[in-house]
Amino acid sequence: MGNADLRQLAAIEETPFADLEGSVVAVDAHNWLYKYLTTTVQWTGADVYTTSDGTEVANLVGAVQGLPKFFEHGLTPVFVWDGGVTELKDDEIADRREQRERYEEQLDDAREAGDAAEAARLDARTQRLTPTIHETTRELFDLLDIPQVEAPAEGEAQAAYMTRTDDAVDYAGSDDYDCLLLGSPVTLRQLTSSGHPELMDFDATLAEHDLTWEQLVDVGILCGTDFNPGIDGFGPTTALDAIGEHGDLWDVLAAEGEHVAHGDRIRELFLNPDVTDDYVIDPDVSPAIDAARAFVTDEWEVDADAVARGFERIDAAAAQTGLDRWT
């Protein structure tokens, strides 16, 4: 999920949706979906949206509730899916698994104690994106004719690359600050929140701190990334000062007598990640509302009332824009 401390360095400002109308946004699908999945579960409980065979489908409710935000503001989302995870993330994944297991134990305790509020909070934290969640969400997006891209590796890296190199893509969409290290020129954050999004500007960040892209990545590595734990005593300010004094990661490490395992590889994962140009984006989407609704409510047994408003909003936005891409 990246290092949230990087916010202290990032050039970020709130941006009205009116300024974004007509834009194409390459969305980190994992990041976006997980936010809606956990929010749905926290407010309703995972058991509320479970099929007769025990399959959890809260993701479908979350997706239907979250998509109208794009459509109502004239944005075309392109959801970019992870194709694989680098081996350097193994430790991070193991840590998350252990943390989830701790939450599951605490969840059992909260349920036994009858603490509904604490149980709801912990239930949300135990969620993970299962293969079924991925498959059902993708099929829903297909029915709604929403563009999707399969990344060869990290979806966020692919989204950043598309924003940087493809004139058809205007913004990346992710709450993960790694988009900054990955060189996304402009990233929209808080797309799952109720207000206007935040715009994170890559060039403005570099200019504000007199950094090169490589040096920004070095600052991130010193603070810690999904691929390394960081160096003790280094936060954004101290890392920035150290890079300013010594020039790059290697000279800082030499001066501090420190070492970052796989440092070269980690640097390359941000500067030259595994990405592809083998994708097609068609912004002229034609959502099949009835088919999508039937998929969610009939095939996956979601209560029709839970998604009625979401589908109504998508349908209304498609009709109101008067643009070819929504008709």
Curated annotation (Swiss-Prot):
Region feature (I-domain): 118-247
Transmembrane segments: none
Keywords: DNA damage, DNA repair, DNA replication, Endonuclease, Exonuclease, Hydrolase, Magnesium, Metal-binding, Nuclease
The UniProt record lists the keyword Nuclease: yes
SMART domains assigned to the protein according to its UniProt record, in alphabetical order: HhH2 (SM00279), XPGI (SM00484), XPGN (SM00485)
Cofactor binding notes: Binds 2 magnesium ions per subunit. They probably participate in the reaction catalyzed by the enzyme. May bind an additional third magnesium ion after substrate binding.
Chain intervals for the UniProt region annotation (Interaction with PCNA): 319-327
EC number per UniProt: 3.1.-.-
GO biological process: DNA repair; DNA replication, removal of RNA primer
Residues engaged in binding Mg(2+) 2: 176, 178, 226
Listed cofactors: Mg(2+)
Molecular function per GO: 5'-3' exonuclease activity; 5'-flap endonuclease activity; DNA binding; magnesium ion binding
Chain sites annotated for binding Mg(2+) 1: 28, 82, 154, 156
Region (N-domain): 1-100
Highest taxon listed in the record's lineage: Archaea
Gene3D superfamilies given in the database record: 5' to 3' exonuclease, C-terminal subdomain (1.10.150.20), 5'-nuclease (3.40.50.1010)
Family: Belongs to the XPG/RAD2 endonuclease family. FEN1 subfamily.
Function: Structure-specific nuclease with 5'-flap endonuclease and 5'-3' exonuclease activities involved in DNA replication and repair. During DNA replication, cleaves the 5'-overhanging flap structure that is generated by displacement synthesis when DNA polymerase encounters the 5'-end of a downstream Okazaki fragment. Binds the unpaired 3'-DNA end and kinks the DNA to facilitate 5' cleavage specificity. Cleaves one nucleotide into the double-stranded DNA from the junction in flap DNA, leaving a nick for ligation. Also involved in the base excision repair (BER) pathway.
NCBIfam families: fen_arch
Self-association state and partner proteins as the record states: Interacts with PCNA. PCNA stimulates the nuclease activity without altering cleavage specificity.
Protein name: Flap endonuclease 1
Source organism phylogeny: Archaea, Methanobacteriati, Methanobacteriota, Stenosarchaea group, Halobacteria
Primary gene name: fen
